Amino acid sequence: MAKSKGARIVITLECSNKSVDISQKRKAGVFRYTTTKNRRNTPGRIELKKFCPNCNSHCVFKEIK
């Protein structure tokens, strides 16, 4: 029988700071991080504060599907 993969899944975190002016950004676009989370411990969507090189500041990154 095959072994289950477990509770860890790969997720994508996207910068949610849309209010930054284009002149303050380093480059256009949206920055994303990939990470893993444990589905059993964190069933809801994750929000982490990380550095966004596009915005050139620390922003809230939200989990996307």
From Swiss-Prot:
Any one of the GO CC terms: chloroplast
One of the GO biological process terms: translation
Keywords: Chloroplast, Plastid, Ribonucleoprotein, Ribosomal protein
Pfam families: Ribosomal_L33
GO molecular function, one term: structural constituent of ribosome
Main location: plastid
Compartmental location: Plastid, Chloroplast
Family: Belongs to the bacterial ribosomal protein bL33 family.
NCBIfam families named in the record: PRK00504.1, PRK00595.1, rpmG_bact
Protein known as: Large ribosomal subunit protein bL33c
